[in-house]
């Protein structure tokens, strides 16, 4: 955990430096990059980090991608959710037929991905949170559970679409690896994604 704590402390130094020396075009977007195998360690450590930030005078807010994804699903029409359930059941009943199983899950995941991206449903939830925090001094937003976006979408596209909306320091806890100054590999196996204008620490 010491390496994660070291990375988090370094990231917070960047956050403070950004607040002091940031210029008009700078958006306070930060990524703590960590090995996907440490997802559970991050989840256990997050409350302690949040408490530490509060002790330092920050107004801490947490946005869970997992909860946001669940909310989008819960808001879908009943008939759509029933269709997904039928697809899931069919996949489980045919688990011996690997090809059929893969096809069923592929259809289900495609439907879920469309639900998340249609009218930017998931992105709008994050944007609403960012808007709510705008103008609130000492606020900081911790975005957790980013692994919940797999296999539907990647956070890089969402960050790009929300450029200009980040008015308070926002920290994304990103399971993956760095492959360059601005390139990341989500969960360590997705293709490299360079659509980032944020500050990266760790990885």
Show which residues each predicted segment covers.
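A short acidic (Asp/Glu
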Residues: 40-47, 71-76, 150-157, 181-185
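Conserved P-loop NTPase "ATPase switch" module shared by AAA+ and STAND
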Residues: 135-152
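Residue-level preference for the first positions of well-ordered beta-strands
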Residues: 27-31, 138-140, 169-171
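Short acidic, S/G/P-rich loop/turn micro-motifs used as interaction or catalytic elements
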Residues: 37-41, 68, 112-119, 147-151, ...
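Long, charge-dense
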Residues: 62-119
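A short, acidic, amphipathic alpha-helical segment used as a generic capping/interface helix at domain edges
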Residues: 14, 118-134
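Glycine-rich P-loop/Walker A and Walker A-like loops and their local beta1-loop-alpha1 context
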Residues: 1-53, 58-62
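Glycine-rich, aromatic-bearing surface loops/beta-hairpins
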Residues: 147-203
